Amino acid sequence: MTDAPNLKGFDARLREEAAEEPTLEIPEQPPTKKTQIIAIYGKGGSGKSFTLANLSHMMAEMGKRVLLIGCDPKSDTTSLLFGGKNCPTIIETATKKKLAGEEVKVGDVCFKSGGVFAMELGGPEVGRGCGGRGIIHGFELLEKLGFHDWDFDFVLLDFLGDVVCGGFGLPIARDMAQKVIVIGSNDLQSLYVANNVCNAVEYFRKLGGNVGVAGIVINKDDGTGEAQAFAREVGIPILAAIPADEELRRKSAAYQIVGSHATPWGKLFEELAGNVADAPPLRPRPLSPDALLALFETDEETRVVDLVPATDEDLRGSNAAPKKSLEVIYDDV
């Protein structure tokens, strides 16, 4: 029988951790080489890992030096490159090495496949710690490994777009990336996340930031056109439209790379690689919630919904019977 965890003061410890200021420092000196650092955001399940693994593989085939970093706590960004095998994460490895009194080496966390260099930042276990702070800590460890001295043409960062805390917004908030790419489909949920990312970019542009949105990759495109309409309204280009193809789905499920000149989809990913490299960072025009919903309106008459305020009696239900007053009433004398 295992001992029950000690939760005394757990809430206070979490608050203290959240209140700490990140220590990650961004070098202020001019870069010595032109490396494109690109942050890719999208809703969970939108196909970020599939798109990035195949994009990075195609870039490597085209002679580019590419580093793919998974910044999603699921730590599955790079698994497609390694036939389904998960890389040991930077945070997990650093913890084990620290307990053993050893230093983390590049070879412990960075691995090669098809010419692509790949690693996973990782994150805390479920219910233990903050995923955003895990991202910050992971980049601090990358700094110690010499991240800014590495020689790459492209560094691709895969970020979860559903979470809005500061750690996941680090590339936007601190100008760590030159540009952002969003992944979306023709569904409201994925475009809602893409619009939130555009909102974050616009917010930090107003504060003097330089990061812009280079475009959107439409994944699982079924031809209904909502994602194309979103891109047009927000003012960002479509970098590629990956079709909703059953063969592509099977290849992805079997951890097979399709971003290669040896496959029928090679030309699609070659064009995507060129567009990603050449697309400039743009200032988006994020949509209001109503404008986003309007993209999905049909030709039928728009349904008008009134917001009816609830009352205290509504919320109490069967307990809403009037209570007897405790007021003392005196007889007239």
Swiss-Prot record:
Q: Which InterPro entries match?
A: BchX, NifH/chlL_CS, NifH/frxC, P-loop_NTPase
Question: Binding of ATP: at which residues?
Answer: G45, S46, G47, K48, S49, F50, K74, N219, K220
Spell out the residue ranges making up region: Disordered.
1-22
List UniProt keywords, sorted A-Z: 4Fe-4S, ATP-binding, Bacteriochlorophyll biosynthesis, Chlorophyll biosynthesis, Iron, Iron-sulfur, Magnesium, Metal-binding, Nucleotide-binding, Oxidoreductase, Photosynthesis
Q: Name one GO biological process term.
A: bacteriochlorophyll biosynthetic process
Q: Does the keyword Iron apply?
A: yes
Concerning Gene3D superfamilies, the annotation shows: P-loop containing nucleotide triphosphate hydrolases
Q: Which GO molecular function annotations are given, in alphabetical order?
A: 4 iron, 4 sulfur cluster binding; ATP binding; metal ion binding; oxidoreductase activity, acting on the CH-CH group of donors, NAD or NADP as acceptor
Keyword ATP-binding among UniProt keywords: yes
EC number annotated for this UniProt entry: 1.3.7.15
Catalyzes what?
3-deacetyl-3-vinylbacteriochlorophyllide a + 2 oxidized [2Fe-2S]-[ferredoxin] + ADP + phosphate = chlorophyllide a + 2 reduced [2Fe-2S]-[ferredoxin] + ATP + H2O + H(+); bacteriochlorophyllide a + 2 oxidized [2Fe-2S]-[ferredoxin] + ADP + phosphate = 3-acetyl-3-devinylchlorophyllide a + 2 reduced [2Fe-2S]-[ferredoxin] + ATP + H2O + H(+); 3-deacetyl-3-(1-hydroxyethyl)bacteriochlorophyllide a + 2 oxidized [2Fe-2S]-[ferredoxin] + ADP + phosphate = 3-devinyl-3-(1-hydroxyethyl)chlorophyllide a + 2 reduced [2Fe-2S]-[ferredoxin] + ATP + H2O + H(+)
Positions with a binding annotation for Mg(2+): S49
Write down the required cofactor(s).
Answer: [4Fe-4S] cluster
What pathway does the annotation place this protein in? Porphyrin-containing compound metabolism; bacteriochlorophyll biosynthesis
SUPFAM superfamilies hit by this protein: P-loop containing nucleoside triphosphate hydrolases (SSF52540)
Q: Which residues bind [4Fe-4S] cluster?
A: C130, C165
Q: Which NCBIfam families match?
A: BchX (TIGR02016)
Subunit relationships: Homodimer. Chlorophyllide reductase is composed of three subunits; BchX, BchY and BchZ.
Q: What does this protein do?
A: Converts chlorophylls (Chl) into bacteriochlorophylls (BChl) by reducing ring B of the tetrapyrrole.
Family the entry assigns: Belongs to the NifH/BchL/ChlL family.
Q: What is this protein called?
A: Chlorophyllide reductase 35.5 kDa chain
